[in-house]
Amino acid sequence: MVMSLTHLATLRALDRLGTMVSVAQVLGYTPGAVSQQIAALETAVGERLVARAGRNVVLTDAGRVLAVHADRILTAEQDALEALRSVNDELSAPFALGVFGSTAAALLPAVMAAAQRRYPRLELTSRELSVDVVVDAVRRGSVDAAIGLDYPIAPMPRGGDTEIITLRRESFGLAMSRDFGETVDADAVHLQELADWTFIIPPAHTPFGAAVRAACRQSGFEPNVRHEIMDSAVTLALVARGLGAAFVTDTMIALNPAAPLTRVRIVDDFSREIVLVRPVASVARRTVRAVTAIVQDVVDDDLEGAIASP
């Protein structure tokens, strides 16, 4: 029996995800089928690749060594397929792009249109992701690349296997109801002046919620959170009704331009970055480079245009 690419892909997934159940969920198998594939691979190489650890399994030393080579082999296979598809200088490969809620509305239509114009045979699909699982989704191979949000004060996980490309950096300001805005005698405030304000922000376990709390704590206070809301449109609607203030960016406002709000600039450096996350090894793939360029152009042109529009 010889090693198959399917067996190697299963071993690589087990090395990355850690459990048979997780591998089964990502690859679309049953846990029993995953176990059978690992057993078949052990027979092929004549070595034990996994060992029991309670209810779970861990890779043996031989398993870890083979997992490293499996990743190289599978990457080489992808590169070979990419090269074959590029023989006629035309992209005709599948590509899954991860997006989060607001990018799906603001960027995805323009990205799809640009891809269709430049590469008619590129099979570009999208998958909505929560912003807190973007890096994991790319690492697991659930998507080929993903648009996400990174907060310098509470950065997303980094690793040697992923690359984070900054597409746009934008500063946070404050949004409040027009009635409350009339009581604020300034067009800019320091964070430390907001200790007595009430806020509408996402929960602490979200990247945005963690970043807001970190910025406030860095300025010496714990934010008074009246409402924990994850949806930007809902947040702005509540702000307009006077239920609290919210931290907003130009992009967030551009997606909800009808909300009757007053905005105040924050003097302190509190910002976020719209980023593209992709596997480091995938840079050699022409599709990855092409989609990266498309997303960068759309962010520069279409998103900038939406923000600049009245």
Annotate each predicted stretch with a short phrase.
Residues R12-Y29:
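Short helix-boundary/capping micro-motifs
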Residues M20, E42-R64:
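A short LG(V/I)-centered, amphipathic sequence patch enriched
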Residues L41-E42, A115:
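Conserved amphipathic alpha-helical core elements
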Residues S92-P155, I229:
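Central regulatory/effector-binding core of bacterial HTH transcription factors
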Residues R118, L129-D196, M252-P257:
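Acidic, Gly/Pro-rich loop/turn segments at junctions of secondary structure
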Residues S130-V143, L149, H205-T262:
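Hydrophobic hinge/microswitch elements
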Residues L149, M176, E182-D185, V189, ...:
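Secondary-structure junction motif
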Residues M156-T166, E170, A233-V283:
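Beta-alpha-beta core module
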